[in-house]
Amino acid sequence: MLERIKGCFTESIQTQIAAAEALPDAISCAAMALVQSLLNGNKILCCGNGTSAANAQHFAASMINRFETERPSLPAIALNADNVVLTAITNDRLHDEVYAKQVRALGQAGDVLLAISTRGNSRDIVKAVEAAVTRDMTIVALTGYDGGELAGLLGQLDVEIRIPSHRGARVQELHMLTVNCLCDLIDNTLFPHQND
């Protein structure tokens, strides 16, 4: 059992090292897209399922409240956080549309959709991205494995941050770290002297 525990830590560290080599440019581009949207008076919509939903909510909470330092609130909405809306849509047997309907209702040109999917194949996330495209929104996709269907939907101005792993747990761990990096970059770009 102890060796298995050490193996989990070792694999996580190795994935973090691989991500540190592969992802800085993509994370930087994503942060700049998010910052530019906020500077233009737009908002960030985010969504995910399971652990990805928790990461989406963490991102939105860090924007609305704060990340590590006090600063003005920033507009972000976790589309998976409103149980009444979610159950109303799924009650009508529209499971695949649970986020797309919200994107069509709330999304505007210039907004960003932060779509988080471990494999990139969740139908409701794919439909949300398709809806965001019709609204002229920028998409930041956090994926893993081979990027899945999401990777094929992204345009030139969109950003995919694909965790270099084929293990769901490692992808999810690095998604959380990536969300924290994005929050840190947004805060330090928009409010560079808040930490002084």
UniProtKB/Swiss-Prot annotation:
PROSITE patterns: SIS. Keywords: DNA replication. One of its GO terms (molecular function) is carbohydrate derivative binding. Belongs to the SIS family. DiaA subfamily. The gene is diaA. GO terms for biological process: carbohydrate derivative metabolic process; DNA replication; positive regulation of DNA-templated DNA replication initiation. GO terms for cellular component: DnaA-DiaA complex. Required for the timely initiation of chromosomal replication via direct interactions with the DnaA initiator protein. This is DnaA initiator-associating protein DiaA. Pfam families: SIS_2 (PF13580). It comes from the Bacteria. Homotetramer; dimer of dimers. Residues 34-196 form the SIS domain.
